[in-house]
């Protein structure tokens, strides 16, 4: 997941958009109740609109190519990322992704997950960014809109999603460049087809997609630059096939007052004489609101912080849902993975390549069967750090030297130490670390002593 640093970038874009419209010279004249309803509606609908924009961009192709594929087809990542990779911030170097954007409006899609010798889990998300299911056993699954009525073949497991739009992210564990061919073989065994094709047993060929130059955009930039009418009418349209949850009835009744909801028609006229200026003013004020909400969801692990429950299955925590969407779509629930971060040493000073540090483990992170862990270093720009070894993380697959007492020390330094076995290269300037713990043992985690970072 792209972390909170991306939220800062996103909201900086909001501020630049706002300043371009002369917002400072304008006084906000929108009545307080209307302003609150607009803000609540925006925060509520933001993940839905961003999911749609992301799908539109990711499926904007006639055939499957690197990073894109038509609806209901696999988008298989094929390469291990390195320091040259700049497409997304805080890239994951532990797993290879296989994604699908689904249209479930006509019939279920059958996803056949093969047997593997490694961590390989399929996260299925609905249009509102909630995790509908996590698939981790081999076999055929029917990814199905919840209101679909029909019979499935024997042996096929039904997976209900409450919306027509859905997204799956399959994460397959990778143990370095030499392991890529094994991951490619697993990807080749993954199968996806409509239920009708699965039942007919014919040789299925997916339909050709389409390409539109106008849809070749960065999704977050696209959504943040929408006018109020564009944003809310897109949300209204999407809510017809991707209905709000039953427990959302209170906020749906509230935002219906400004014509936001399934089948509604929003007009910018309610914003007065300068709707775009008033809109930009509102977006600017949302930034401190969401940032202020962030801290209450933080969980501590020693000097590390991570986003805790209900991440990935948000319920009525709409502010949290919007915050995480801005920081990066596809967040796992905590039982699947947690992502602790630190940017300081054990004295609270920012980490910088001007110094060398010892990352000290008393014990490695506790994981359940099939789980794994890693620690990755990122520069101040949130990208991987170039180094002569092309080593970007240390993990449970690293051949680390263990101290006599069973502890492990990792050297964090720009320059290589005499023994490079336990060296994690860092940047010249400031840097930070992300720990990824997949399938964590949450009970043991509460008693676990997280690694400390000590200035050498």
Enumerate the predicted regions with their spans.
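A compositional/structural signature for long, glycine/proline-rich flexible linkers
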Residues: 25-456
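Bacterial N-terminal signal peptides that target proteins for export
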Residues: 1-8
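Bacterial N-terminal signal peptides
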Residues: 8-17
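Sec/Tat signal peptide C-region and signal peptidase I cleavage site
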Residues: 20-24
């Amino acid at each position: 997941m792209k972390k909170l640093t991306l939220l800062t970038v996103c909201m900086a874009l909001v501020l630049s958009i706002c300043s371009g419209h002369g917002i400072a010279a304008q006084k906000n004249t929108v009545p307080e109740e209307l302003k609150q309803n607009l803000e609540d509606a925006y925060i509520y609908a933001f993940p839905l609109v961003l999911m749609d924009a992301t799908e539109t961009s990711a499926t904007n192709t006639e055939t499957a190519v690197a990073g894109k594929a038509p609806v209901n087809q696999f988008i298989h990542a094929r390469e291990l990322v390195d320091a040259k990779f700049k497409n997304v911030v805080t890239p994951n170097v532990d797993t290879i992704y296989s994604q699908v954007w689904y249209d479930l409006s006509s019939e279920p899609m059958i996803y056949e997950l093969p047997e593997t010798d490694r961590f390989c889990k399929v996260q299925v998300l609905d249009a509102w960014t909630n995790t509908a299911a996590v698939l981790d056993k081999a076999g055929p699954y029917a990814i199905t809109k919840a209101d679909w009525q029909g019979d499935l073949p024997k042996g096929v497991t039904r997976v209900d999603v409450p919306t027509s739009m859905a997204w799956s992210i399959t994460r397959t564990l990778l143990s370095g460049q030499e392991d890529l061919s094994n991951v490619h073989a697993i990807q080749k065994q993954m199968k996806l087809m409509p239920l009708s094709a699965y039942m007919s047993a014919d040789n299925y060929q997916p339909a050709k997609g389409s390409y539109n130059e106008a849809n070749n955009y960065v999704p977050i930039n696209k959504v943040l630059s929408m006018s109020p009418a564009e944003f809310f009418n897109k949300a209204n349209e999407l809510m017809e096939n991707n209905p709000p949850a039953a427990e959302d009835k209170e906020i749906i009744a509230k935002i219906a007052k400004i014509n936001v909801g399934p089948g509604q028609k929003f007009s910018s006229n309610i914003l007065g004489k300068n709707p775009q200026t008033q809109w930009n003013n509102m977006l600017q004020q949302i930034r401190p609101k969401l940032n202020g909400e962030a801290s209450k969801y933080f969980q501590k692990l020693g000097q590390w912080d991570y986003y805790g429950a209900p991440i990935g299955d948000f319920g009525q925590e709409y502010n949290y849902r919007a915050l995480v969407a801005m920081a990066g779509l596809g967040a796992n629930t905590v039982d699947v993975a947690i992502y602790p971060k630190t940017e300081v040493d054990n004295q609270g000073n920012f980490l910088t390549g001007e110094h060398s540090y010892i990352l000290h483990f008393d014990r490695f992170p506790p994981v359940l069967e099939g789980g794994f862990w890693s620690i990755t270093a990122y520069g101040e720009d949130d990208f991987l750090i170039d180094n002569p070894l092309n080593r970007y993380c240390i993990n449970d697959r690293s051949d680390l030297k263990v101290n006599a007492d069973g502890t492990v020390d990792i050297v964090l330094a720009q320059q290589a130490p005499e023994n490079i076995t336990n060296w994690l290269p860092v940047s010249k300037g400031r840097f930070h670390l992300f720990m990824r713990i997949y399938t964590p043992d949450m009970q043991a985690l509460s008693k676990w002593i997280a690694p400390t970072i000590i200035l050498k």
